């Protein structure tokens, strides 16, 4: 499990934190000892809010242990949000675990979250309105109109630039209701989605956005938008689902669906 929401409206997502994450090498007696890839399940299965999670973290020990699918201990950090709107980031680095209040509601990958917050200082000039005209020794220069306030917004696919873009988009997009919010979030994440072929790793493999997940903490609803089909799928955490004793799978399409008019 890499993201999800529980019946109390607590949501969490695990993101890659390569080069930064440093987990315990051994288990500790009297603590919940789990691997990095098990943390999200533990969070959603044990906590009801961000505050509640913070109170339980002293009893958690994240141990470097490989996931069978990959054969490695996955370097991860986590973003957690609850029904009150509180948002936190959990990172485990060389000097221990850090549970950090997230004032911007955004997280990407490495570097550490504190670095990303400091880097925002380089982009305080960004705004949704045009820059005013300037006078250079009597020569008046006008901006090229709407959109000029975002000049300098980084456009590459690094985690650093994606963080800046998402913070900017989140800050200035219109505030809307739940169903509209999902559509709004889809538009926001369009700006940071990585298409196949534009980001190649050192080993020659592609890094791309396999899917987007949207979580409604008020109603415990999960929305998924896969790469190969931009249809948004919706699953509500109903009483019926919670009472099942076996996992329930919901199939999604592997090719883009179209609404044909003729």
Where are these regions (language model features)?
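Short helix/loop capping segments that flank catalytic or ligand/cofactor-binding pockets
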Residues: 22-23, 88-91, 98-102, 109-110, ...
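A contiguous strand-loop segment
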Residues: 1-31, 59-60, 64, 251-253
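Short, surface-exposed beta-strand-loop junctions and turns on beta-sheet-rich folds
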Residues: 18-20, 95-97, 228-232
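Alpha/propeptide regions of enzymes that mature by internal proteolysis
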Residues: 30, 34-60, 168-194
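Structural recognition of the beta-strand scaffold that forms the well-ordered cores
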Residues: 11-14, 79-81, 89, 214
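C-terminus-biased signal that marks the final domain/tail of proteins
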Residues: 66, 74, 83, 107-262
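Aromatic- and glycine-enriched pocket-lining scaffold segments that form the walls
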Residues: 50, 54-91
């Amino acid at each position: 499990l890499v993201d999800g929401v529980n019946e109390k409206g607590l949501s969490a997502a695990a993101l890659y934190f390569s080069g930064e994450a440093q987990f315990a090498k051994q288990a500790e007696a009297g603590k919940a000892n789990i691997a990095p890839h098990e943390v999200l399940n533990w969070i959603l299965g044990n906590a009801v809010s961000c505050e509640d999670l913070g109170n339980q973290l002293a009893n958690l020990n994240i141990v470097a242990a490989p996931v069978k699918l990959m054969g490695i201990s996955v370097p991860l950090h986590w973003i957690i949000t609850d029904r009150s709107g509180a948002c936190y980031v959990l990172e485990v680095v060389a000097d221990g675990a850090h549970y950090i209040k997230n004032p911007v509601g955004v997280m990407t990958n490495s570097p550490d979250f504190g670095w990303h917050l400091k880097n925002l200082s380089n982009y305080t000039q960004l705004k949704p309105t045009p820059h005013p005209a300037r006078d250079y020794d009597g020569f008046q220069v006008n901006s090229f109109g709407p959109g000029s306030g975002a000049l300098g917004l980084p456009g590459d696919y690094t985690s650093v630039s994606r963080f800046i873009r998402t913070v900017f988009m989140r800050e200035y997009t219109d505030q809307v209701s739940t169903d509209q919010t999902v559509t709004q979030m889809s538009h926001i994440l369009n700006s940071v989605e990585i298409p196949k072929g534009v980001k190649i790793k050192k080993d020659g493999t592609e890094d791309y956005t396999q899917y987007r997940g949207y979580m409604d903490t008020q109603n415990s609803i999960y929305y998924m938008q896969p790469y190969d089909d931009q249809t948004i799928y919706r699953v509500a955490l109903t009483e019926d689902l919670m009472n099942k004793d076996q996992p329930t799978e919901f199939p999604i399409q592997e090719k883009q669906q179209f609404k044909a008019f003729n």
